[in-house]
A protein has these predicted regions:
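Extended, charge-enriched "interface" segments that sit outside catalytic cores
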Residues: 58, 82, 86
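Non-catalytic, polymerase-adjacent accessory regions of viral genome-replication enzymes
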Residues: 1-67
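Generic, well-ordered alpha-helical scaffold segments in large soluble proteins
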Residues: 7-10, 14, 72, 110-119, ...
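Conserved pre-motif C helix in the palm subdomain of viral-like polymerases
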Residues: 95-124
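Basic, low-complexity intrinsically disordered segments
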Residues: 87, 123, 130-135, 140-143
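Conserved catalytic palm subdomain of right-hand nucleotidyl-transferase polymerases, strongest
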Residues: 48-57, 99, 138-159
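Conserved phosphate/pyrophosphate-binding and hydrolysis machinery centered on Walker-type P-loop NTPases
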Residues: 59, 101, 130, 134
Length: 159
């Protein structure tokens, strides 16, 4: 199987061709190297050691677990686990619900994220900052500071 880096580079280059139609993207979910890369990108992030509803964490991730995920993808039996619900405090003193995914589901989501980002990232505008590579609240605020000179007020909302 091709390396994930080569696949992602190829997907990105095809995204530049207007009207290109991708075929069989699903087969990339059968590549164990994608899961290794996803594990490397996800393992060290804060909060990812929290056990999901299945009680498993990234500490217990191994090749056998990845093979099991891939086999369930191949025979179309993969089914994400329900999120474990917990509540975290908000600034206003209320609680916000937070869903904790299982580590297997986080891994699959990261693989899918890499694939979809390589295809669609270049289509987003420079003013879009949420959940994008090398973008954050800080980059959004920096852009506001540069482009919104003279603005006297903003409206804040909680969606």
């Amino acid at each position: 199987m091709r390396s994930p880096e080569a696949v992602l580079k190829s997907l990105k280059s095809h995204s530049e061709s207007l009207g290109y139609q991708y075929e069989r993207l699903y087969r990339n979910l059968f590549n164990p190297a994608f899961y290794l890369l996803a594990y490397q990108q996800t393992y060290s992030k804060p909060g990812n050691m929290s056990p999901g509803v299945d009680g498993k964490t990234f500490d217990g991730m191994n090749h056998a677990r990845v093979d099991k995920i891939i086999n369930s993808m191949k025979n179309h039996s993969y089914c994400p686990n329900p999120a474990r619900r917990t509540y975290i405090p908000k600034k206003n003193g209320k609680l916000r619900p937070l869903g904790i995914q299982s580590s297997d589901d986080k891994l699959v989501q990261q693989v899918m994220k890499m694939i979809l980002e390589s295809i669609y990232e270049d289509t987003f505008t420079d003013t879009s900052h949420g959940f994008r590579p090398n973008r954050s609240c800080q980059t959004a605020l920096s852009q506001i500071k540069i482009n919104f000179t003279g603005v006297r007020w903003f409206i804040e909302g909680d969606i």
